[in-house]
Amino acid sequence: MKEKLETLLAAIQPADQTLRQAIQAHLDDLTKPQGSLGRLEEIAQQYILATGQIHPSLPKKKICCFAGDHGVAAEGVSAFPAEVTPQMVYNMLHGGAAINVLSRHVGAELSVVDVGVNHDFADAPNLVQCKVKRGSANMAVGAAMSETETLQAILAGAELAFQAADAGYGLLGTGEMGIANTTPATALYAVLLNLPVEAITGRGTGIDDARLHHKIAVIERAIAVNAERCATPFGTLAALGGFEIAAITGFILGAAARRIPVVVDGFISSSGALVAMKMVPSVVDYLFFSHLSAEQGHGAVMEALGVRPMLSLDLRLGEGTGAALAMQLVDAALKIYNEMATFSGAQVSEKIEG
């Protein structure tokens, strides 16, 4: 399996910059003051550079919501019990979750991926079964996952990206479901970005002050216990991550290898993206960070990564909800690029120089 991961990493190339001048020339020729559509122009340019399609069609969209349970939930770091994870998966499978509503709204197909839920599901439409294990181990007392388990989860995510590419999807989105998963995500940020735990630990599902202080202590203990395992991004992911986070890492790596842009959801999904970027820095060329989460610390993470989220709506749900909303902006940007008239073709006078 290690060889498969090495092959995957080697397949990822930076976005082809040779089209940049032609893209910019077309954007500047559109019937508007140059640069006046701001981020929409940047989004169109990034999408075209990533895919290499100078005349991009509107992409077929797919969101994968990865689900997993966490041993660290036993430490009491969440306001909700762990059994909520499978309950929410069932809610998604029945079409009643926020991500169901928003994915339908934006015309994205939704797949719910069981990569580590502490429950066995019967086969169902839109459910992808690739369980590595029924929940991670408690990272406060040892590694959350073994190296083999981490590899399995990464490669499962990558395989889903490959399947999406083969099925003609041109824009992918990440989502997640896992009670207590802000705890491993925060630990990953603290170690991989050298950020202080206390400054980036948030309330997750709505914990009170006492539980927040306890959560900070649990994360600090987990980092100390696993210090020797955190020499590499992969080792850090195994020690402090979770199955759904590892699968998101693999999903992003697989998409980048196939030159498919990915819209990254919020606080949890960004931790999977961070690991992917630490493994192959050029992965960032294929990523749209959908929104600035209301979860404490996400702003510091975005700043440390040098990226600008597309939206700021005080979202803190996860599931892929922010990714779904941001997909509409990608569509809008490509429509602007494809459908606006040009000065050279519409007989509109350009700016007077001087």
Curated annotation (Swiss-Prot):
Record's keyword annotation contains Transferase: yes
Mind listing the GO molecular function terms for this protein?
nicotinate-nucleotide-dimethylbenzimidazole phosphoribosyltransferase activity
Keywords of the record, alphabetical order, are: Cobalamin biosynthesis, Glycosyltransferase, Transferase
Sorted alphabetically, the Gene Ontology BP terms of this entry are:
cobalamin biosynthetic process
Q: Does the keyword Transferase apply?
A: yes
PANTHER family in the record: NICOTINATE-NUCLEOTIDE--DIMETHYLBENZIMIDAZOLE PHOSPHORIBOSYLTRANSFERASE (PTHR43463:SF1)
> Know the name of this protein?
Nicotinate-nucleotide--dimethylbenzimidazole phosphoribosyltransferase
Instruction: Please report the organism this UniProt entry assigns to the protein.
Output: Chlorobium chlorochromatii (strain CaD3)
Please state the gene responsible for encoding this protein: cobT
